[in-house]
Amino acid sequence: MAASTNRLRFLYSSARTVPQTGSITPISRRTYATTEPSPSATGAPATARKRTNFTDKLNAGPSFADFVSGGEDNTPLEPSEAYALKTAMVGPAGRKKEMTRLPSWLKTPIPDSKNYQRLKKDLRGLNLHTVCEEARCPNISDCWGGSDKSAATATIMLMGDTCTRGCRFCSVKTNRRPPPLDPHEPENTAEAISRWSLGYVVLTSVDRDDLADGGARHFAETVIKIKQKKPSMLVECLTGDYLGDLEMVKLVARSGLDVYAHNVETVEALTPFVRDRRATFQQSLRVLEAAKQARPDLITKTSLMLGFGETEEQLWDALRQLRSVGVDVVTFGQYMRPTKRHMPVHEYVTPDQFELWRQRALDMGFLYCASGPLVRSSYKAGEAFIENVLKKRRAAGTAGESVTDSKAAVDEATR
């Protein structure tokens, strides 16, 4: 035991007497990698190493002092710089071409929240479709990603996921002969909506020109089922033009809904190039006018996409015509190309321009206008305002027909 102790003492004393060489430095304290200059071994005052290239700057990174003091890297951008579009060369060697990158104000997070997954599961379980998914809406993570279902907004797409028309901006599937209607869809839709404890819901549909009534009776039946399950529910219907059959428009308008929406999509001059040839700007105006005539208290709504190459005068003309048929609400959003098969984007409109057109629409007498790069016709920002207007009207006793009266109107129209 004594021998072992003496041996340990010898090794310890030997280690302490190892001569220091130029390649070995005694460690007096624990060190960490920082962005601050470290003191030299000789004790001479340290100087910050000059950043010579991008790699040095990236490796060093900003210190806390850099953030506090601001500096040239934190100087706010001018609007012209912030809204400047950037380009990139893409493609294989020898065949590269210049493409405009998506502006920063159009980028949205990938949907992955628990509420998004739960909402999606409910829809799949009842064999329902949403325009949020079919049209690849950029707001899906925002509208579906609320902390609870009451904060979520989903636009239910009726009559299947296949359209009989082929608009050049739309990513929904097309076919001349889509599958037949699901007779259980109105009941399933009402059931799904009743589960979510929503106060406001949007119903839309594909165009079904293969049906004699364009699906108007199916639409009306869905509204009636929803109102029967929850009379307090506010319902917005975004419909097609029913090939100009105004009786079908009036049928849906009298079904008990609260907001009748039909989108003109673009200005009149560009309509033949943007929409299916069976749709015209004047026909859409007649649809909106017929809905208002069927129920004067009904809020009517439409939407336009910007970025197709429209001019200011064309937009002014579109707004004047919409006001002339009593449209109450208009929305503006940026056209975003779904695939290479669709129309290219002519222009990315800046947020400042969207705000300008919002003010112009309000000055013209529209009840409400939602305008922004990511705004879509059923975006929840507009619905919150419309919901408050409808509740005030209902409290004042001017909300329109009851569910019973609406059912009678539908029965009469469908004889």
Swiss-Prot record:
E.C. numbers: 2.8.1.8
Metal-binding keyword on record: yes
Domain Radical SAM core: 146-367
Record flagged with keyword Iron: yes
Biased composition (Low complexity): 33-47
Annotated binding of [4Fe-4S] cluster 1, by residue: C132, C137, C143, S378
Transit peptide start-stop: 1-32
Reaction(s) this enzyme catalyzes, per UniProt: [[Fe-S] cluster scaffold protein carrying a second [4Fe-4S](2+) cluster] + N(6)-octanoyl-L-lysyl-[protein] + 2 oxidized [2Fe-2S]-[ferredoxin] + 2 S-adenosyl-L-methionine + 4 H(+) = [[Fe-S] cluster scaffold protein] + N(6)-[(R)-dihydrolipoyl]-L-lysyl-[protein] + 4 Fe(3+) + 2 hydrogen sulfide + 2 5'-deoxyadenosine + 2 L-methionine + 2 reduced [2Fe-2S]-[ferredoxin]
Superkingdom field: Eukaryota
Molecular-function GO terms, alphabetical: 4 iron, 4 sulfur cluster binding; lipoate synthase activity; metal ion binding
NCBIfam families linked: lipA, PRK05481.1, PRK12928.1
Similarity comment: Belongs to the radical SAM superfamily. Lipoyl synthase family.
Record-linked HAMAP family: Lipoyl_synth
Name of the molecule in the record: Lipoyl synthase, mitochondrial
Species assigned in the record: Aspergillus flavus (strain ATCC 200026 / FGSC A1120 / IAM 13836 / NRRL 3357 / JCM 12722 / SRRC 167)
